[in-house]
């Protein structure tokens, strides 16, 4: 009988130090927290390394500056040390997200992004990044 195990993690710290071995996780669900990581590149690499082959990461995040979220969240967010610091932005743009994924070794065929740019939901500037590690 398989059991579901879940953990709350510190995304800014090494996952192996938190008891999560490389290639040991089947699924990661992260909603609205990657943009609060000190360094999104580092945190995403940690997540991808923790996934087993065939594992899935579901990452829901705003893309681009989202003034509604900035009004409340920017006061609680960590000071970034990644592309957001360089560009003085709160949230990564779509192209910056892709650079994060490509930098982690994720290929285009491993990544699905919804909603599409033509969706009625597109103006909300929220994306779900679905990654299946090969």
Predicted regions, residues:
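Core SAM-dependent methyltransferase catalytic element
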Residues: 104-106, 113-134
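C-terminal alpha-helical "lid/dimerization" subdomain adjacent to the S-adenosyl-L-methionine
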Residues: 58-104, 108-115
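Conserved SAM-binding strand-loop segment of SAM-dependent methyltransferases
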Residues: 2-14
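Flexible loop/turn segments at secondary-structure boundaries
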Residues: 12-17, 35-38, 64-70, 99, ...
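A short SAM/SAH-binding and catalytic strip from SAM-dependent methyltransferases
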Residues: 25-40
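A short acidic, Gly/Pro-enriched loop at the edge of an enzyme's catalytic core
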Residues: 15-28
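A short glycine-rich, Lys/Arg-flanked "PGG" loop and its adjoining helix->strand segment in the class I
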Residues: 41-56
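Generic beta-strand/beta-sheet core signal
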Residues: 6-9, 28-31, 59-62, 111-114, ...
């Amino acid at each position: 009988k398989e059991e579901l195990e879940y953990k709350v993690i510190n995304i800014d710290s090494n996952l192996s130090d938190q008891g999560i071995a490389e290639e040991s996780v089947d699924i990661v669900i992260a909603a609205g927290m990657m943009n609060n990581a000190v360094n999104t590149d580092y945190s995403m690499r940690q997540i991808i390394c923790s996934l087993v082959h065939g594992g899935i990461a579901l990452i829901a995040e705003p893309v681009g500056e989202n003034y509604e979220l900035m009004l409340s969240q920017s006061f609680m967010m960590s000071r970034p040390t990644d592309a957001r610091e360089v560009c003085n932005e709160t949230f990564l743009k779509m192209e910056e997200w892709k650079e994060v994924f490509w930098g982690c070794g994720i290929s285009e065929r491993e990544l699905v992004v919804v909603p599409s740019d033509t969706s009625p939901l597109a103006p909300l500037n929220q994306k779900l990044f679905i990654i299946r590690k090969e």
